């Protein structure tokens, strides 16, 4: 089983098509193509969304947390050789849970597991944590376009 470790932002851009300001993961700790991925997003006070999402009490918008989870899950499929250079299209996001505010200075650790991948359609589940506490979670179905 192939395991890809310590993937920096530049290397992430070779796998997924998202770019600043919409690349919402900073680093992938591990990708097991077709199985799982672990990544994180550091919450710098300079993130563009903190200036507009409750400036007096900045927090990462929930939908950007959802996007960060989807980007992490997409690594499991886009890292497969046959999908290199491909893109995804989200078909559904289910059981979305936003349990904890994600604020400047925190690190959102994201773990994604691919549940199935058949005929270009992937399904998986993702959990985002701050420390040991669950901050967000969701299940996704998406289509892969090579």
For each predicted feature, which ranges?
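Catalytic strand-loop segment that frames the active site of acyl-thioester-processing enzymes
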Residues: 20-60
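Hydrophobic core residues within well-ordered beta-strands of beta-rich domains
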Residues: 22-24, 108, 122
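Active-site helix/loop of acyl-thioester processing domains in fatty-acid/polyketide metabolism
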Residues: 28, 60-83
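Beta-strand-rich interaction surfaces with strong enrichment in secreted/lumenal proteins
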Residues: 13, 56-57, 97-100
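Flexible, low-complexity linker/boundary loops enriched in proline and small hydrophobic residues
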Residues: 3-29
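HotDog/MaoC-like acyl-thioester-processing domains
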Residues: 2-4, 34, 103-106, 113-146
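Conserved positions in beta-strands of structured domains
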Residues: 26-29, 94, 99, 113-115
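Hydrophobic beta-strand-centered segment that forms part of the acyl-chain substrate-binding groove
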Residues: 2-6, 72-109, 137-143
